[in-house]
From Swiss-Prot:
Entry EC no(s): 2.3.1.234
Keywords per UniProt: Acyltransferase, Cytoplasm, Iron, Metal-binding, Transferase, tRNA processing
Reactions it catalyzes: L-threonylcarbamoyladenylate + adenosine(37) in tRNA = N(6)-L-threonylcarbamoyladenosine(37) in tRNA + AMP + H(+)
Record bears the keyword Metal-binding: yes
Principal location listed in the UniProt entry: cytoplasm
Gene (UniProt): tsaD
Protein's recorded name: tRNA N6-adenosine threonylcarbamoyltransferase
InterPro entries given in the database record: ATPase_NBD, Gcp-like_dom, KAE1/TsaD, Peptidase_M22_CS, TsaD
Gene3D superfamilies, alphabetized: 3.30.420.40
Positions annotated to bind substrate: L134, V135, S136, G137, G138, D167, G180, D184, N279
Cofactor comment text: Binds 1 Fe(2+) ion per subunit.
GO cellular component terms listed in the entry, alphabetical order: cytoplasm
Organism the protein comes from: Nostoc sp. (strain PCC 7120 / SAG 25.82 / UTEX 2576)
Amino acid sequence: MTTVLAIETSCDETAVAIVNNRQVLSSIIASQISVHQQYGGVVPEVASRAHLETINGAIAQAMDQAQLGWDKIDAIAATCAPGLVGALLVGLTAAKTLAILHNKPFLGVHHLEGHIYATYLSEPTLDPPFLSLLVSGGHTSLIYVKECGRYESLGETRDDAAGEAFDKVARLLKLGYPGGPVIDKLAQTGNPQAFALPEGKVSLPGGGYHPYDGSFSGLKTAVLRLVQQLEKDGDSLPLEDIAASFQATVAKALTKRAIACALDYGLDTIAVGGGVAANSGLRQHLQAATAANNLRVLFPPLKFCTDNAAMIACAAVDHLSRGHTSPITLGVESRLSLSQVMKLYQ
């Protein structure tokens, strides 16, 4: 039985959690959404300062919630890549300090590997191989999960990530930040077939389309042109219908690629991770399509779809059980491929 305290500060959530194997003992998430709303997005310098102000209290809360002493903690982990460099440094430095102070092993964890492991928090018996659909504000990828630390990217977005597209369309419609939840809410009362929008296929040099890669920039532009035309005609914007049509288009595009990828590679399980995994439209499309194709789809609990430290701790537990630890000199990286996860360990 391995107990890990993990810290996640890659973007705008200050999160600390303690996990025993795949059981969450405590999970603290201090969101900065209200801080960044006035700017319409995350401001890196503001995020770093907010992490500094919150991190010590979050660690204390996590320890209190778990009702554990430091003697019961086996290792300390923190997200080290990818993410905002200043934000990552706050969490990584705090984790290293705790590891040195309490003489514990230290592990750096890849943020996207954490999102893969979020599914394990509700499905502790899940075993590779399976297909991971990672959909967040910064990443949209189809990942072949072979085992802990071994990942192969099979498809990705060529431009905007799914979550980024939601934020940009919400900004275009003057709905505020973050865009995902508000578009999802509006879409509940809208007509998803009101407007035909492009799914964003990626052409191949020899003709045809890439089966697993996608693009959301064209979809975003199509919504912009739709809004401009409606305003030019003097029509009021049917926000619910636009939201529903946009959300359905994103969900259909992601679902088609995920299903095709799983079937082509003989994988019977699709595990979805990242903030967009909370989207009701995506969940409905994937559940229907997987059932029709005799596949299984798994989602993390809603509270573990967005950034959290429990998923980071869960990944660290698996690495530690394999004898993996990180050097205390490990730094942060704004970009790091999932295929390079093992460079974090010694």
